[in-house]
Amino acid sequence: MRRLDRPRLRDAIKLSTDEKWSHYEGDDPSTIGWINPENAPSIEQINAKFQELNAAEPMRLLREERNRRIAETDWWASSDLLISDDQRKYRQALRDITKTADPQLNEFDELINVTWPEKP
């Protein structure tokens, strides 16, 4: 399964403030060089946003993979052929997976704890 980059500190900074910054090192908010430090968000605010982004990452990846799998079968629903009951159930199970799955990431940043429906 394709894996995109995890959220990074720059993502948390961008979502925490409109304040301009010039640099940072790694994922350490204490290294951020602010252009106007008196208007900068606190390290706690940036860390909170960073944790929020990381907590949402498994569900974001689940939706991305689900959308890819649905797109693979779009031709079923848009072709002149009649879609079978198994095909219809498969597509519905993919749409419903975000309601039932509790996705997590393993040490390799791969989705685990997800049972995908079998493609007919």
Task: Mark where each language-model region is.
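A preference for well-ordered globular domain cores
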Residues: 1-120
